Amino acid sequence: MDLPLFLRSIDALTPWLRRITALSLSGADAAALQAAGLEAEAAMFRATGGVNTHKGALFSFSVLLAALGRYLMEGGDVFAHAAALAAELTPPRDTHGTEVARRHQVGGARAEALAGFPTARKAAELLQTHDPLTVLLWLMAHTEDTNLYHRGGAEGAAFVKEQAAAILAAPPEQRVALTQALDDALIECRLSPGGSADLLALLLNSSSTVFPSFDR
C-alpha cells in the first residue's frame, strides 16, 4: 500500500459515501443502505486492484453518515441512530473480522458502531485539547483493532497497545521520534493499526453536528 493507492481508493469511495447519505435522508431502510455499502466496497476493490485499503473505514463512515441522515430527518441522538442502524445490518460472514471476533473475542469496527462509537466519542473530546498524533496514539492504546489481531494475533495487538501507551507517557517533545521508531518496527513486523487510523479519520472528517463536543 502507498499514498497513490489510498488516494485512488478515496476517489472511488467518495461518491458512494454521498450516495449513502442521500439514501438515508430519503428514508432508505438498512437493507438499501447495506446494498449501497457493498457496491461502494466493490468500487474500492476495482480501484485498488483487489487491495483492502478502506473496508473498515467504509463501514464506520457509512454507518455514521447514515445515522446523521436519520438524525436530520427524525431528531434524537446521532449515536443512538448509529447503534440501531448497525444492529439492523446483516452481519458479514467468513471475513477476517469475523474470524478475529471468534478467535479472540474482540469486536472491532462493528462492535464500536453497535455501542454507539464510544471510543470515537472519547477521542473527539481529546482532540479538543490535543494534536492528532496524540489522539492517534491514544486510539492505538485503547482500540480493539481487528486488523492487528488478524496480522499479529493477541501478542501483536498487545505490543501496539503497550508501545502507544509508553509513547504517551514519555515527554511530549520525544513523541514524534518515538512514534517514527514505532512506525519502523510495525513495518518490519507487518502490523498496521488501521482501526485506530479509521477512527481518527472519522473524527477529522466530522463536525460538531456529529460530535457535539467537537468544534474544530
Please identify what each model-predicted range represents.
Residues 48-65, 69, 189-205:
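Conserved phosphate/anionic-ligand binding catalytic regions in large, soluble enzymes, centered on
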Residues 36-39, 43, 60-63, 67, ...:
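Generic beta-strand or strand-like secondary-structure segments
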Residues 208:
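A compact, surface-exposed functional segment
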Residues 1-26, 30-31, 55, 68-184, ...:
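Phosphate-rich cofactor/ligand-interacting catalytic cores and adjacent structured alpha/beta frameworks
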Residues 28-48:
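Active-site cofactor/substrate anionic-group-binding motifs, chiefly glycine-
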